[in-house]
Swiss-Prot record:
Pathway: Isoprenoid biosynthesis; isopentenyl diphosphate biosynthesis via DXP pathway; isopentenyl diphosphate from 1-deoxy-D-xylulose 5-phosphate: step 5/6. Keywords: 4Fe-4S, Iron, Iron-sulfur, Isoprene biosynthesis, Metal-binding, Oxidoreductase. This is 4-hydroxy-3-methylbut-2-en-1-yl diphosphate synthase (flavodoxin). It comes from Chlorobaculum tepidum (strain ATCC 49652 / DSM 12025 / NBRC 103806 / TLS). It holds the Pfam family GcpE. Its EC number is 1.17.7.3. Coiled coil: none annotated. Disulfide bonds: none annotated. One of its GO terms (molecular function) is 4 iron, 4 sulfur cluster binding.
Length: 746
């Protein structure tokens, strides 16, 4: 597709079935079909491969709106793509995928891991295929699995070898291609490409990639075009940087080749270890692909190198869930540095909510899926967003004293948790507050910075005074919450902040706003959202905020609390923006029942997505978790969103058949030795495939380079190559020392 922009209108045209099709703006209610001569068709296809073409798409206005809904759930309807015995996309359930870590040449071990994944319910199984020999052995693995009655679709994971891809496609249901590694030359050079050089390199890619496309089409095998943030080609990086724009363009280049060959069984992935980059890349891909490509192709979602334990689950849930909440995603993989079987239940826990919401909207099979999506987008009109979907910028807000810590402005988001003991049990409540604030810890330790205490009526005020007096200087860390409007004036002189809970269907007492002033505690208006629409909390809070602003009040915060605050808080941010109001927003998530894993996943999605969007000046969780775990969850969410670093960040891959050391054991050992280095980012990679590239997002890297061998990196630069694995950890620590990043553990 080519776009042209004139002063009065914009149009696009593309070649389809030997016709020259002009797409006019919505004001033009027709398509013009003009027969295309061979020269024009060849010329346009050549243009479509050039970087100049890509830039014209960008400047012509294709990227105007993010086409996904952000205030309610509606799934993006995509073309259904075959995966052997199943399909994905369309209105079908969101599928869960995993990947074995056994070497593909080890038939028995590979079959055993596939069997265990099958028994765990895994719907798609991926295997790494680094060489032609590995590709040939897929036949043996497949045959044994089918003899055992296991018909789970298999995916061949290809990075560098076109020959391996040509063989592997014969034995799998899907083949994954990494555009950054496939048919590319040297990596991480600083070469600047001229337009002619760029076009020539892209022509080479087309020449090497087209045979695979034709073979996959003839065999009925689908293809995932999977870009990784850490392994973009030099050609792409030279023009777009190591960025979401580069990730998207890399994938679209390969997709255009597929479409030119009449091959439409495609899907995309845009993976990164940086959750924000991953979210931005998928959103940008959807905006561009739905505008430029023939079909709306399915998406495979995942955060690569997410790590292990709670951190890995939180990062995966946040990145995947943020996109699922926007209606994007047809299959997912949770990449954990653990046994692959552990990924499966986490994946199903993430997609359950969305699969449960899946509604059949009628048979529209007679219409191309893209037409359905375009119709919905046009009928919906322009939707204002309170955030930048393709880049990060924090929502502007004023800075206030929010109870002993700054809230809003440029301040790092604070952490608040709620005490569960009642005010009537003063001794237990005091003990719980001290356990949460943990004043004996170092100043920068992970602990709750604020604790909220509930007060139900005027009779509780004397108990509150006694409690606050017993806390001494810590009283400024106490947030008092109440739903009783009448006692707010009495509470304001006592503590650092008062939170007034606004209950649906109830009215605020008269005279409250007139009684407020900035000399007392800050006040937070918190809407308890239960049954009303997503618009109601924002409407109520913005009306209140406008009145407070008119009175000149500064020490004001706003929030919405529920077990699903994402859509309503986005709406609040939008309405505040439209009204020119810049009070800080607290991100609140409350869920006091359910299993730990569900609470962890949903809080990461609901709260974490808002911080990735740049919305939120404080995080406050109320859960059934133990206090220490709840506090850790708050900090883990902020760190995964890259909004506040509170400990060492480990970027560790899940391993695959390319890995020649014990990744889980090694990761645990490295964590044990360096986890006290707050804010430092350390990459632990099984092999070179994503390793050096993802080092761009890490300060130091530990990357497998062969059997018993490891290479060490500073950023993307390899500084020690092929050193013995037994020496690697100590040499990594020494490298950290040499670069002035080491401090002795306390």
């Amino acid at each position: 597709m080519v776009n042209s922009k004139a002063s009065s209108f914009r149009f696009s045209f593309f070649i389809h079935n030997s016709a020259f099709i002009i797409l006019f703006p919505p004001s033009f209610s027709r398509l013009l079909f003009i027969p295309a001569i061979g020269y024009l068709q060849d010329h346009l296809q050549s243009l479509s491969t050039s970087r100049l073409m890509s830039e014209e798409r960008l400047v012509s206005g294709n990227i105007i709106d993010y086409p996904a809904p952000v205030y309610s759930y509606r799934r993006r309807v995509t073309r259904e793509v075959p995966f052997g015995t199943i399909f994905l996309g369309g209105y079908l359930p969101i599928r869960v995928e995993s990947m074995i870590t056994a070497h593909t040449m080890d038939t028995a071990a590979s079959v055993e891991q596939c069997r265990r994944l099958y028994e765990a319910g895994c719907e798609i199984i991926r295997l790494t295929v680094p060489t032609e020999k590995d590709a040939e052995n897929l036949k043996n693995i497949r045959e044994q699995l089918r003899r055992d009655g296991i018909d789970t679709p298999l995916v061949a994971d290809i990075h560098f070898s076109a020959k391996a891809a040509m063989k592997a496609v014969e034995f799998v249901e899907n083949i994954r291609i990494n555009p950054g590694n496939y048919a590319t030359g040297a990596k991480f050079s600083s070469k600047d490409y001229t337009d002619d050089e760029y076009r020539a390199e892209l022509d080479k890619v087309r020449e090497e990639f087209t045979p695979l496309v034709r073979k996959a089409r003839s065999l009925g095998v689908s293809m995932r075009i999977g870009t990784n943030h850490g392994s973009l080609s030099d050609r792409i990086v030279s023009r777009y940087g190591n960025s979401p724009e580069g990730m998207v363009e890399a994938a679209l280049e390969f997709s255009r080749i597929c479409e030119d060959e009449g091959y439409y069984d495609q899907l995309f992935s845009m993976k990164s270890s940086n959750v924000r980059v991953m979210i931005q890349a998928y959103r940008l891909l959807v905006a561009r692909a739905d505008a430029e490509l023939r079909y709306a192709y399915p998406l495979h979602l995942g955060v690569t190198e997410a790590g292990d334990g709670d951190e890995g689950r939180i990062k995966s849930a946040m990145g995947i869930g943020a996109l699922l909440e926007d209606g994007l995603g047809d299959t997912i993989r949770v990449s954990l540095t653990e046994d692959p079987v552990n990924e499966v239940p986490v994946g199903f826990a993430i997609v359950k909510k969305y699969n449960d919401m899946l509604l059949v909207r009628g048979d529209r099979a007679h219409l191309p899926v893209k037409h359905v999506i375009e119709h919905e987008r046009k009928s919906a009109g322009h939707v204002q967003l309170p955030f930048e979907p393709f880049s990060y910028s924090r929502r502007p807000s004023i800075s206030i004293d929010g109870a002993g810590i700054p809230v809003g402005g440029d301040a790092l988001p604070g952490v608040e948790t709620a005490a569960h003991a009642p005010i009537t049990d003063t001794e237990s409540l005091r003990d719980e507050i001290l356990a949460r604030l943990d004043p004996g810890k170092p100043e920068d330790a992970i602990r709750s910075e604020l604790v909220s205490v509930g007060v139900g009526s005027a009779e509780d005020i004397s108990l509150l005074k006694a409690l606050l007096d017993s806390l001494g200087n810590l009283r400024e860390k106490i947030v008092v919450s109440t739903a009783d409007t009448s006692i707010v004036p009495a509470l304001l002189p006592l503590c650092g902040r008062v939170r007034l809970d606004i209950v649906e269907g109830e009215t605020l007492g008269t005279g409250l706003i007139e009684s407020l002033h900035d000399r007392n505690a800050a006040i937070e208006f918190c809407f308890i959202h239960e049954k009303s629409s997503e618009n109601v909390p924002a409407e109520v809070l913005v009306r209140l905020a406008a009145k407070l602003k008119a009175r000149g009040l500064q020490r004001v915060m706003l929030s919405i609390v529920s077990d699903a605050p994402l859509y309503s808080t986005r709406k609040l941010a939008l309405e505040l923006k439209k009204a020119g109001l810049d009070y800080p927003i607290a991100v609140r998530y409350r869920r006091l029942d359910g299993e730990r894993s569900g609470v962890l996943i949903q809080s990461a999605i609901q709260a974490g997505t808002l911080f990735c969007d740049g919305i939120g000046d404080l995080i406050a969780l109320e859960t059934n978790m133990p206090a220490s775990e709840e506090v850790s969850l708050c900090f883990n969410i902020l760190q995964a969103a890259r909004i506040r670093m509170s400990k060492t960040e480990f970027i560790s891959c899940p391993g695959c058949g390319r890995t020649y050391f014990e990744l889980e054991k090694t990761t645990a050992l490295i964590k044990q030795r360096v986890s006290h280095l707050k804010g430092l980012k350390i990459g632990i990679m099984g092999c070179i495939v994503n390793g050096p590239g993802e080092m761009a997002d890490a300060d130091f890297g530990y990357v497998g380079s062969g059997k018993g061998r490891v290479s060490l990196y500073v950023g993307k630069e390899c500084v020690e190559e092929n050193i013995p694995e037994a020496e690697a950890l100590e040499r990594l620590i020494e490298l950290i020392r040499q670069n002035g990043k080491w401090v002795d553990p306390v």
